[in-house]
């Protein structure tokens, strides 16, 4: 995050130098402990060498590598970027905290969306199976009514084939 901020300051200074404008804004200087502001009539980035002792986070030692920019005298000619690369002992690059927070927020959002989708699908399945297999469902009610009609004697005679009905009437 600090590197991004410093990169933005460098681009701003390039813009101010190319337009030959001198602003009376405070100039940013990177110190060992923190960022400080220093009033200056000229906009130029002062490069300082920064040495960082390896930090141990969760049992993994991190190493910070800084590239040294040109001296202040050569800053007018070419201002290069200051880059910070964090590497753990496992060989992979460590992810910044802001990136971890962003990924955790994205993962949480995806979890909420998936849980919402599962609950909607579960509700639909519950409603469908309740309609199909409940004792008060329309299919069960019509099924019971059909069984009563089939078991009734008048219903049985009406469902016989026509030839059986005629044979019964005509036979002595």
From Swiss-Prot:
Write out the coiled-coil annotation as residue ranges: none
The entry's keywords: Membrane, Mitochondrion, Protein transport, Transit peptide, Translocation, Transmembrane, Transmembrane helix, Transport
Query: Signal peptide: which range, if any?
Result: none
Q: Where is the transit peptide?
A: 1-18
- List the subcellular locations: Mitochondrion membrane
- The record's region (Disordered) falls at 68-98
Entry's Gene Ontology BP terms: mitochondrial cytochrome c oxidase assembly; mitochondrial respiratory chain complex I assembly; protein import into mitochondrial matrix
Bilayer disposition of the protein = Single-pass membrane protein
Q: Tell me if Mitochondrion is a UniProt keyword of this record.
A: yes
Q: What does this protein do?
A: Participates in the translocation of transit peptide-containing proteins across the mitochondrial inner membrane. Also required for assembly of mitochondrial respiratory chain complex I and complex IV as component of the MITRAC (mitochondrial translation regulation assembly intermediate of cytochrome c oxidase complex) complex. Probably shuttles between the presequence translocase and respiratory-chain assembly intermediates in a process that promotes incorporation of early nuclear-encoded subunits into these complexes.
The family line of this record is: Belongs to the TIM21 family.
Specify the protein name: Mitochondrial import inner membrane translocase subunit Tim21
């Amino acid at each position: 995050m600090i590197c991004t901020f410093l990169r933005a300051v460098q681009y701003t200074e390039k813009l101010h130098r190319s337009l030959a404008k001198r602003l009376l804004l405070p100039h940013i200087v990177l110190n060992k402990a923190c960022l400080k502001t220093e009033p200056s009539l000229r906009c130029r980035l002062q490069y300082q060498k920064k040495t960082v002792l390896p930090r141990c986070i969760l049992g993994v030692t991190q190493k910070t590598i800084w590239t040294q920019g040109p001296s202040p005298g050569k800053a007018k000619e070419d201002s290069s970027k200051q880059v910070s690369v964090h590497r753990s002992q496992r060989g992979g690059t460590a992810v910044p905290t802001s990136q971890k927070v962003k990924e955790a927020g994205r993962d949480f959002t995806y979890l909420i969306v998936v849980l919402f989708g599962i609950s909607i699908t579960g509700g639909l399945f519950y409603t469908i199976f309740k309609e199909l297999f409940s004792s008060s469902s329309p299919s069960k009610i019509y099924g019971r009514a059909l069984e009563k009609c089939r078991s009734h004697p008048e219903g049985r005679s009406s469902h016989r084939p026509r030839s059986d009905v005629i044979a019964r009437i005509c036979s002595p």
